[in-house]
Swiss-Prot record:
The gene is ileS. This is Isoleucine--tRNA ligase. GO terms for cellular component: cytosol. It catalyses: tRNA(Ile) + L-isoleucine + ATP = L-isoleucyl-tRNA(Ile) + AMP + diphosphate. Its EC number is 6.1.1.5. It holds the Pfam family tRNA-synt_1. One of its GO terms (molecular function) is tRNA binding. A motif ('HIGH' region) lies at residues 58-68. A motif ('KMSKS' region) lies at residues 602-606. ATP binds at K605. The keyword Kinase does not apply. Coiled coil: none annotated. Its cofactor is Zn(2+).
Length: 938
């Protein structure tokens, strides 16, 4: 028997079947670094229209987690897809380097500043620590396959950036947005510092809930208001609170002007409550026998005075819009030094902003004899005992509620009035302008707009000062007596900024005021406060984007971070940019959800359900992690687990196998000389290129919309359905058995070449390592890297006017599917082995029959059978299978006649008819020794 294997065009490629990504990717990274791939891309894109994605800086502390990976991979997908779309899209990664977490780490190792080290030495240690953290995180980000200017990132602790942060504050001061005030701010007693909104987390806490009676100073005036004369016992206004420790700072009782308030007679006294809450309060305090003596509107009680239960003063009733009927008594204990609503209404009524609590959370001397020096959270019991002793406590119980806590210490925080510097939301219209700017930004997903609008509309002034060691100094001088800013503040700040640009923030603390103030130095003091770290990152649109040469003065097109950044970086950036420039710093804002485990639970080390990106990369490779990110809908929570990553790896194998099939069948193909013109190609091959064209349109649209899971779904559908289960199956016969240089084979290779050129580019933003690997095996002259080019423009398709147009092949796909069902049943019944052992007769109604007949003898190649004939639908025998999909089709199957050709495996009756090749069929003889078979359609 002759060996005809050598006459076949068997697929051959060096592209490995197994990805072995964990082993191969580091080598690719080394090549990217050695070649300066990022620099090559920048050179290739020079002069193109720009797209700037400004990196929100992660905090330089600790190893990267799965959330970091999601963020950086999403950014990288966008940057790479924009590059392929013809943009110059530089990516400058950044890090947030100042602030409390770094201070705490350094304190743990070296002690607090001033103990073993001077403040200057402490700052140097902080800088050193941050630098090591940056290096560690940078290695992991690079390992993810993220391309960027990793050699020249921006750090908020770079001297120039620190200087520009000071300049940003100067601009805000110049525009009139800064003011100083003793306002209640979130205060952590462990940090001994004010906290930003974004540094506050909420946890359940058990607190005492108390109802307290404030006796009226003028009992007769109240009787007159309610129109009663006979009241048994004193009259009191009752407040409800869950923070008894704030009662020493009480300066008023807030009531709602339009609520009805009832005077209620109970045993031995009368109490004033919101009428709608009388029943619930009576139940709470355990009173069943009570009488409502009269009612008045809250406005009638304004400025009547009530005695503080244990302090030596009385307080007014005032009117406030913040009073609700959700809980309590309808009368709100008001301490302007301990709450933002209280502060606002206190300003309106000229109340004292009392703050009897020190920075460590203990009462200051002179507050109250039994409270001085006591921690506020331990004081609740003392205050409750005092109220009981004074006869003012109507009820006490425990309640669990959501309470603000420090994000770092996880301990409860307090509102505490301290002298701080604020960016005002309203004194120069910052709130109104910010709300206007929000409307001009595209928010992705679109619910982000309502979220940040609500936050801006309701947020208090931004406290930007901190009492910390490691941070950018505010660089202000205030008058010793008046505490007013120096009249030349902006000029002085620029002088400080110049020094910081040379020597870093230490230049401020080393500065002798006389150096820049001269004789005025005796009248002014340096403000010791540092800036909130959210000011550092929030000003990077100015301190980084405006000054980096690669951005060429263009504002950022996009900010992309987790959904928690509406109140964090998106907010601080919007505030600062609007205060400085009157406009938003971004055109688009994209947010992604948090990562959760496979059961939708938040990731936690204590539960043991965290997924380490380092582990995933070391076991599966970065491309699997990237594919998981891209295939997950980032607009909600992003579930990840070993099982989910295994599914991503399965999808990866499908894509890799498709790419490998293309490459293996391009063996011996030189596009420069072997390409077949579209009009001369086999129709099915043109259809396949048209499928790629349609897929590319969908994929590019999805990339443009940042809809990456749709990119992956469309890519998978193309590989699995259009190619894998139809086209690639059909062409194997022609590809392997036709003459090597025949139009039939070269047409097929031309299609595969066009498809591969498109596919490798679709993959590149997501499966960057694999795309780079595929690129190296593609035939023809090309640039060294796929990332320097643009989307493939060589695709074409069938015209609708052609008889065998896309609709024709769509119907053929359905016919093929119906034939497959019949073959599978025959295999199950042991009537045939493989499909080539079968011959089918298609009984079709006239319109479908005409389409099938048009393919002539090539119909069998589409159906992967050794024989295929078309007959009239009405002639179908009883055992023909009626199609459920195509009503005008019945399929009958029989065993193919003739012998099996050992070369093409088809069963035909002309095997052995040619003496010189007595073992093979006539078609194979033509392909081996003759002119080769001709194919028009398939």
């Amino acid at each position: 028997m002759s060996d005809y294997k050598s006459t076949l065009n068997l697929p051959e490629t060096g592209f490995p079947m197994r990805g072995d990504l964990a082993k191969r990717e580091p080598g690719m990274l080394a090549r990217w670094t050695d070649d300066d791939l990022y620099g090559i891309i920048r050179a290739a894109k020079k002069g193109k229209k720009t797209f700037i994605l400004h990196d929100g800086p992660p905090y330089a502390n600790g190893s990267i987690h799965i959330g970091h990976s999601v963020n950086k991979i999403l950014k990288d997908i966008i940057i790479k897809s924009k590059g392929l779309s013809g943009y110059d899209s530089p990516y400058v990664p950044g890090w947030d380097c100042h602030g409390l977490p770094i201070e705490l780490k350094v304190e743990q190792e070296y002690g607090k500043p001033g103990e073993k080290f001077t403040a200057a030495e402490f700052r140097a240690k902080c800088r050193e620590y941050a630098a090591t953290q940056v290096d560690g995180q940078r290695k992991d980000f690079i390992r993810l396959g993220v391309l960027g200017d990793w050699s020249h990132p921006y750090l908020t602790m770079d001297f120039k950036t620190e200087a520009n942060i000071i300049r940003a504050l100067g601009k805000i001061i110049g525009n009139g947005h800064l003011h100083k005030g003793a306002k209640p701010v979130h205060w952590c007693v462990d940090c001994r510092s004010a906290l930003a909104e974004a540094e506050v987390e909420y946890y359940d806490k058990t607190s005492p809930s108390i109802d307290v009676a404030f006796q009226a100073v003028d009992q007769d005036a109240l009787k007159t208001k309610f129109g009663v004369s006979n009241v048994n016992g004193p009259i009191s206004l009752v407040i409800w609170t869950t923070t008894p420790w704030t009662l020493p700072a009480n300066r008023a009782i807030s009531i709602a002007p339009d609520f009805d308030y009832a005077l209620v007679q109970i045993d031995g006294q009368a109490v004033i409550l919101a009428k709608d809450l009388v029943e619930s309060v009576m139940q709470r305090i355990g009173v069943s026998d009570y009488t409502i003596l009269g009612t008045v509107k809250g406005a009638e009680l304004e400025l009547l005075r009530f005695t503080h239960p244990f302090m030596d003063f009385d307080v007014p009733a005032i009117l406030g819009d913040h009073v609700t009927l959700d809980a309590g008594t309808g009368a709100v204990h008001t301490a302007p030094g301990h709450g933002p609503d209280d502060y606002v209404i206190g300003q309106k009524y000229g109340l004292e902003t009392a703050n009897p609590v020190g920075p460590d959370g203990t009462y200051l001397p002179g507050t109250y004899p039994t409270l001085d020096g006591v921690n506020v959270f331990k004081a609740n019991d003392i205050v409750i005992a005092l109220l009981q002793e004074k006869g003012a406590l109507l009820h006490v119980e425990k309640m669990q509620h959501s309470y603000p806590c420090c994000w770092r210490h996880k301990t409860p925080i307090i509102f505490r009035a301290t002298p701080q510097w604020f960016v005002s939301m309203d004194q120069k219209g910052l709130r109104a302008q910010s709300l206007k700017e929000i409307k001009g930004v595209q928010w992705i997903p679109d619910w982000g707009q309502a979220r940040i609008e609500s936050m801006v509309a309701n947020r208090p002034d931004w406290c930007i000062s901190r009492q910390r060691t490691w941070g950018v100094p505010m660089s202000l001088f205030v008058h010793k007596d008046t505490e007013e800013l120096h009249p030349r503040t902006l000029e002085l700040m620029e002088e400080v900024a110049k020094r910081v640009e040379v020597d870093g923030i230490q230049a401020w603390w080393d500065l002798d005021a006389k150096e820049i103030l001269g004789d005025e130095a005796d009248q002014y003091v340096k403000v010791p406060d540092t800036l909130d770290v959210w000011f550092d990152s929030g000003s990077t649109h100015s301190s980084v984007v405006d000054v980096r040469p690669e951005f060429a003065g263009h504002a950022a097109d996009m900010y992309l971070e987790g959904s928690d950044q509406h109140r964090g970086w998106f907010m601080s950036s919007l505030m600062i940019s609007t205060a400085m420039k009157g406009k938003a710093p971004y055109r688009q804002v994209l947010t992604h959800g948090f990562t959760v485990d496979g059961q939708g639970r938040k990731m936690s080390k204590s539960i043991g359900n965290t997924v380490s990106p380092q582990d995933v990369m070391n076991k599966l490779g970065a491309d699997i992690l990237r594919l998981w990110v891209a295939s997950t809908d980032y607009t909600g929570e992003m579930a990840v687990s070993d099982e989910i990553l295994k599914r991503a790896a399965d999808s990866y194998r499908r894509i890799r196998n498709t790419a490998r099939f293309l490459l293996a069948n391009l063996n011996g193909f030189d596009p420069a000389k072997d390409m077949v013109k579209p009009e001369e190609m086999v129709v099915l091959d043109r259809w396949a290129v048209g499928c790629a064209k349609a897929a590319q349109e969908d994929i590019l649209k999805a990339y443009e919309a940042y809809d990456f899971h749709e990119v992956v779904q469309r890519l998978m559908r193309f590989c699995s359905v259009e190619m894998g289960s139809f086209y690639l199956d059909i062409i194997k016969d022609r590809q392997y058995t036709a003459k090597a240089d025949s139009v039939a084979r070269r047409s097929c290779q031309t299609a595969l070449y066009h498809i591969a050129e498109a596919l490798v580019r679709w993959m590149a933003p997501i499966l960057s390592f694999t795309a780079d690997e595929v690129w190296g095996y593609l035939p023809g002259e090309r640039e060294k890297y796929v990332f320097t080019g643009e989307w493939y423009e060589g695709l074409f398709g069938l015209a609708d006017s052609e008889a065998m147009n896309d609709a024709f092949w769509d119907e053929l796909l359905k016919v093929r599917g119906e034939v497959n069902k019949v073959i599978e049943q025959a295999r199950a019944d042991k009537k045939v082995g493989g499909s080539l052992e079968a011959a089918v007769t298609l009984y079709a109604e006239p319109v479908l029959a005409a389409k099938l007949t048009a393919l002539g003898d090539e119909l069998r190649f589409v159906l992967l059978t050794s024989g295929a004939t078309v007959a009239d639908y009405n002639d179908a025998p009883a055992d023909a299978q009626q199609s459920e999909v195509l009503k005008g089709l019945k399929v009958a199957l029989s065993k193919a006649e003739g012998e099996k050709c050992p070369r093409c495996w088809h069963y035909t009756q002309d095997v052995g008819k040619v003496a010189e090749h007595a073992e093979i069929c006539g078609r194979c003889v033509s392909n081996v020794a003759g002119d080769g078979e001709k194919r028009k359609f398939a």
